[in-house]
């Protein structure tokens, strides 16, 4: 049966829900940014990671220049890391922002969010940048194009705040400290997701890099599955899980 012509947003939502579409949905839930695109559009890193106007302009090119059905303004995985006490290098024009200092890496460090949280979270420059970029995209596209927000889940945030190697080692050496990290950080993606939806995002990409390249599938089951089951329903919009790397052996857990 033929399907009437759809807007990009209608097409994306229909595809997400397994419903008929007028043509295959073309979209990226993470980022389409590359050097050639930056040269064509104008904005480059680091400004496109730190200033809302360049961020929104570069994100908009996914639809305006390439015809994708969705746009995504948060290009990296460390946008909210400074708001939880990390030091992030945003200066490299050739790379994504990279965490440089993990406040919980010292074993004597107290696992807690910064003083003033959650107000301090929304005062962070890079959090503000992402929210303002979403507002600009909403003003530009209205309800025509799917605007995707993105948050890091507690596992990826733990990589930033705890240090990747130390965190992964402690899944065996000190699992209680790992659980405390996950417990402490679980509120962050909920707050950020809701703020992005209020700013104009239509759905949230939830990035938690519990990949087979780093941990066994049973660790996802034991540490993270039940948290995802509790946290994701608190986001009042469609949520799309993103997990880079080898993940086939945990797909069944993702489905749960």
Regions found by a protein language model. Name each.
Residues 55, 80-82, 89, 98, ...:
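Alpha-helix termini
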Residues 107-114:
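Residues forming anionic-ligand binding surfaces in small-molecule and nucleic-acid pockets
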